[in-house]
Swiss-Prot record:
GO molecular function, one term: rRNA (pseudouridine-N3-)-methyltransferase activity
Native source species: Nitrosomonas europaea (strain ATCC 19718 / CIP 103999 / KCTC 2705 / NBRC 14298)
E.C. numbers: 2.1.1.177
Broad class of enzyme this protein falls into: transferase
Location within or outside the cell: Cytoplasm
Function: Specifically methylates the pseudouridine at position 1915 (m3Psi1915) in 23S rRNA.
Superkingdom, taxonomy of origin: Bacteria
Similarity section: Belongs to the RNA methyltransferase RlmH family.
Keyword Zinc part of the UniProt annotation: no
UniProt keyword Signal, yes or no: no
Descriptive protein name: Ribosomal RNA large subunit methyltransferase H
InterPro entries assigned to the protein according to its UniProt record, in alphabetical order: Alpha/beta_knot_MTases, RlmH-like, tRNA_m1G_MTases_N
Major subcellular site: cytoplasm
């Protein structure tokens, strides 16, 4: 199965690419981690936030893998411990269905994307830079996989 990270934003600093790549390479083929960067809508002219989010929403829909389990990352989502994430991962992998995590841009996500999600998670109660959210999600997915496989990476 595959874990897709669909992230609005395509010009991340080098530390984001390096951090994400580190954990992506650690994931085994049976739980492949794939990143799709979505170009944010340009904030020019008279476009309001709703119009910007709508344009980004359409871009997200075009790259969303068909039939996947959709998890939106949002600061108002459910907070889960690492152990709970490991349980969720075990359930997702048991279903055989790919999972798509969606990270919004500077203005968040359009309500339509939030409504189509099967689950809504928060990485933190704090607002995080979007690049850091990618790295943190990749690390936590690797950690959850390690827990489920009794790998020594996670030491509780």
């Amino acid at each position: 199965m595959k874990f897709h990270i669909l992230a609005v934003g395509n010009k991340m600093p080098d530390w984001v690419r390096k951090g994400y790549t580190e954990y992506c390479q650690r994931m085994p083929k049976e739980a492949e981690l794939l990143l799709v960067e979505i170009k944010p809508e340009k904030r020019v002219g008279s476009k309001n936030t709703r119009q910007l989010l709508q344009a980004e929403s359409e871009r997200i829909r075009t790259v969303l893998p068909p039939g996947c389990h959709i998890v939106v990352l949002d600061e108002t989502g459910k907070q889960a411990t690492t152990m709970k994430l490991a349980e969720m991962m075990d359930r997702w992998m048991g279903s055989g269905q790919d999972v798509a995590f969606i990270i919004g841009g500077a203005d968040g996500l359009h309500q339509d994307i939030k409504q189509m999600a099967h689950e809504k998670l928060a990485l933190s109660a704090m607002t995080l830079p979007h690049g850091l959210a990618r790295v943190l999600l990749a690390e936590q997915l690797y950690r959850a996989f390690s827990i489920n496989r009794n790998h020594p990476y996670h030491r509780a």
